[in-house]
């Protein structure tokens, strides 16, 4: 959750990319 952080409640793993 460093970049965007919780993109529409995405998965925690994807939260990093999004």
UniProtKB/Swiss-Prot annotation:
What is the superkingdom listed in this entry's lineage?
A: Eukaryota
The entry's keywords: Calcium, Glycoprotein
User: What does the tissue specificity note say?
Assistant: Shell nacre.
Q: What GO biological process term is on the record, naming one? A: shell calcification
Drop me one GO molecular function for this one. calcium ion binding
Q: How is it modified after translation?
A: Glycosylated.
Query: What further fact does the record state?
Result: On the 2D-gel the determined pI of this protein is: 4, its MW is: 95 kDa.
Physiological role: Calcium-binding.
Q: In its UniProt entry, what is this protein called?
A: Calcium-binding shell glycoprotein P95
